[in-house]
Amino acid sequence: MNKEWSEQNKKLQMLIKKADTFDQGKDVLFELRNDLMNTLLSFRKDLNREDFDSMPFMNADGYHSKNIAYSIWHIFRIEDIVAHTLIKGDDEVLFSGNYQRRINSPVITTGNELVKEQISDFTKQLNIDELYSYIADVKKSTEEIIRSLTYSDLKLGIPD
């Protein structure tokens, strides 16, 4: 998957650089996003709750010290914040869908401030079914935003 992913990513980067292939680039992006979501959905099907919270490398440096539930939360919080706060300027899915309560998350951030046992304590509180509902809604809303973007939008800056 890594080689295929890398090739698709190169194709995406090439296509979005030109106005006449920009929409094809978005199609490649959607394919990559679907591949990622299918992998995450296979985790939901194949793993048990303990697997989502397991931290076998808690004392390692970098991303190896995290767990699956945290990684899913972290990635989709970043996407939600960027898509809605920075690009569209509207309410994040976390808030509009009342997901903080539904997921039972004590934080609204990406979780960067959490380390070691804090990550483990955090993810043990999460409702995994609702986390998966959240990521599906974030994916859907982000893709609606992406579909609306034009090549000329790439030249726009982020408003203050």
Model segments located where?
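Aromatic-glycine hotspot motif
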Residues: 1-69, 78-160
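Histidine-centered divalent metal-coordination motifs
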Residues: 74
